[in-house]
Amino acid sequence: MSEKGRLFTSESVTEGHPDKICDAISDSVLDALLAADPRSRVAVETLVTTGQVHVVGEVATSAKEAFADITNTVRARILEIGYDSSDKGFDGATCGVNIGIGAQSPDIAQGVDTAHEARVEGAADPLDSQGAGDQGLMFGYAINATPELMPLPIALAHRLSRRLTEVRKNGVLPYLRPDGKTQVTIAYEDNVPVRLDTVVISTQHAADIDLEKTLDPDIREKVLNTVLDDLAHETLDASTVRVLVNPTGKFVLGGPMGDAGLTGRKIIVDTYGGWARHGGGAFSGKDPSKVDRSAAYAMRWVAKNVVAAGLAERVEVQVAYAIGKAAPVGLFVETFGTETEDPVKIEKAIGEVFDLRPGAIIRDLNLLRPIYAPTAAYGHFGRTDVELPWEQLDKVDDLKRAI
């Protein structure tokens, strides 16, 4: 069926958005613990509201000093984001920080530490000894629409959000404040992006800024035009784009004073902008024994290599686990009719090339490292500003040989 005139929209938010503050805090705590003890088991949730931060969850770690220093870790990340004054609605130096972290459940730990394969089935392979930390299903996706093999709407929305933060932090637009959102609507014909239809940019700003005379033209020139100038997708027509800057009017009250924030509430922003399916599990604050995170990363790794190998123009891969089991209970590959090889053969090749047991994913992607804080904003996938192991194209030749 023709898709002429169909519009698809994705959004992004800046690191100063209340939910993203929480993701950043949770991942900063995770990184601090992993840096001191790579075997730390971490499940940390954060809530922010006016003048307060609450950090709760479960942890098992030998990193006593890092654990004791969590309050300072929290404050440092808030200040780095840019909330350093009550004039901005939040101050990392003076806000209240409440820590309520307990120990990891031994019932969960037993299934992770000694998987069903080792405990019941007598498996001798060390990688069979680590079970999945929970049941669940995870998706990965890749498409040849952008150099980073991401859907164009979310890729463009993230570029705009990153640019908003960049012009604030480097002083190009010093009156901007940390909270902000972007939204991109693109017109598609036969599943190909052809026209940039609408861009929405909402940003927190100082109280004395004139929206019509200052904010709107500045955002168009310093944010939108800069991103569009760098847009590699040459066939995208941006000549008639509708631009909406702060369409509600002034945006002075932002951050935790404007809205409470919570870890894990931006899972579509974190992944594929709604273009691909999502298994439901959030990422931030979770160590890689949690397959919600590590297996979703592995699925992106799989999907990206499949597309890069030329086996399909776009692919979505699902994996599923049972708690306490090492081997996945299911693997499903969808190529949307864009495959160059039989999808059954592609699925078989994936099974031969990628070891999707949790212990193997952690080993192959080297996940027991403090690499997670940068992922807390601007997406976990398709990043061009940081190097992430699940974005590497190291299995292309292996997949071609397996086919």
Swiss-Prot record:
SUPFAM superfamilies referenced in this protein's UniProt entry, alphabetically: S-adenosylmethionine synthetase
BP terms from Gene Ontology: one-carbon metabolic process; S-adenosylmethionine biosynthetic process
Coiled coil: none
Note on how the cofactor is bound: Binds 2 divalent ions per subunit. Binds 1 potassium ion per subunit.
Gene3D superfamilies from the UniProt entry: 3.30.300.10
Binding sites annotated in the UniProt record for L-methionine: E58, Q104, D259, K290
Enzyme Commission designation: 2.5.1.6
Main location: cytoplasm
Binding site for ATP: H17, D179, G180, K181, K250, F251, D259, R265, K266, A282, K286
Chain residues that bind Mg(2+): D19
UniProt similarity note: Belongs to the AdoMet synthase family.
NCBIfam families per record: metK (TIGR01034)
Name of the protein this chain belongs to: S-adenosylmethionine synthase
Gene behind this protein: metK
